[in-house]
Curated annotation (Swiss-Prot):
<comment type="subunit">
    <text>Interacts with host RGS16.</text>
</comment>
<comment type="function">
    <text>Plays a role in modulating host cell signaling by binding to and degrading host RGS16. Not necessary for virus replication.</text>
</comment>
<dbReference type="GO" id="GO:0042025">
    <property type="term" value="C:host cell nucleus"/>
</dbReference>
<keyword id="KW-0945">Host-virus interaction</keyword>
<dbReference type="InterPro" id="IPR008500">
    <property type="entry name" value="Circovirus_Orf3"/>
</dbReference>
<protein>
    <recommendedName>
        <fullName>Protein ORF3</fullName>
    </recommendedName>
</protein>
<keyword id="KW-0053">Apoptosis</keyword>
<keyword id="KW-1035">Host cytoplasm</keyword>
<feature type="short sequence motif" description="Nuclear export signal">
    <location>
        <begin position="1"/>
        <end position="35"/>
    </location>
</feature>
<keyword id="KW-1048">Host nucleus</keyword>
<dbReference type="Pfam" id="PF05614">
    <property type="entry name" value="Circovir_ORF3"/>
</dbReference>
<feature type="region of interest" description="Disordered">
    <location>
        <begin position="78"/>
        <end position="104"/>
    </location>
</feature>
<dbReference type="GO" id="GO:0030430">
    <property type="term" value="C:host cell cytoplasm"/>
</dbReference>
Length: 104
């Protein structure tokens, strides 16, 4: 399992893309990325495009935390639906389709 401290720049394969930077004002804590080869310790539902920000529904997770994963192609990872971070499979194609809607 890969533990990533805040504000570091390293390469991690995610859904066919590579992650350039993972930034957070808070320490990473919790679950895992829903892919066999990548484990990132942060709440997956907090990953977001600015227009699609989502929070965990659990009271313990409600805060001003902001997590952002920057991909090498310049896109941020899309927000995943709440409660599906352990089973949701996001393919490179779906990431590209989602990302393209924000490039107008």
């Amino acid at each position: 399992m890969v533990t990533i401290p805040p504000l570091v720049s390293r390469w991690f394969p995610v859904c066919g893309f590579r992650v350039c930077k993972i930034s957070s004002p808070f320490a990473f804590t919790t679950p895992r990325w829903p892919h066999n080869d990548v484990y990132i310790g942060l709440p997956i539902t907090l990953l977001h495009f600015p227009a699609h920000f989502q929070k965990f529904s659990q009271p313990a997770e409600i805060s001003d935390k902001r997590y952002r994963v920057l991909l090498c192609n310049g896109h941020q990872t899309p927000a995943l639906q709440q409660g599906t971070h352990s089973s949701r499979q996001v393919t490179p194609l779906s990431l590209r389709s989602r990302s393209s809607t924000f490039n107008k």
